[in-house]
Amino acid sequence: MRCISRLPAVLLILSVALGHLRATPVGSGTNPQVDKRKCNTATCATQRLANFLVRSSNNLGPVLPPTNVGSNTYGKRNVAEDPNRESLDFLLL
């Protein structure tokens, strides 16, 4: 319970600290994919804070599993799959 009572103060301090961060412009490099993955300081800090808060405690709500964004995620189409039968099943309704 002591941890929960200190949470508003910690969040207030973190929000003030994040408010003072300045966004840095993303410089153009030679590789456009690397440029897309760069982020400014405020964005990275906000994402890390959100990630920490979501996974920090069970008392604050559900702990969400990490998002799977790899090549084998749900919804990706298998290249070797036969598209004739499975892709037309919705038309039979």
UniProtKB/Swiss-Prot annotation:
Coarse class of the protein's main subcellular location: secreted
InterPro entries to which the protein is assigned, alphabetical: Calcitonin-like (IPR021117), Calcitonin/adrenomedullin (IPR021116), Calcitonin_CS (IPR018360), Calcitonin_peptide-like (IPR001693), IAPP (IPR000443)
Signal peptide bounds: 1-23
Tyrosine amide PTM sites in chain numbering: Y74
Disulfide bonds: C39-C44
Domain of life: Eukaryota
One Pfam family of this chain: Calc_CGRP_IAPP
Tissue: Abundant in the islets of Langerhans but is not present in the brain or seven other tissues examined.
GO CC terms: extracellular space; neuronal cell body; secretory granule
Subcellular location: Secreted
Gene3D superfamilies reported for this sequence: 6.10.250.2190
A single BP term in Gene Ontology: amylin receptor 2 signaling pathway
Family note: Belongs to the calcitonin family.
Quaternary structure note: Can form homodimers. Interacts with IDE and INS. Interaction with INS inhibits homodimerization and fibril formation.
Protein name: Islet amyloid polypeptide
Taxonomic placement: Eukaryota, Metazoa, Chordata, Craniata, Vertebrata
Gene: Iapp
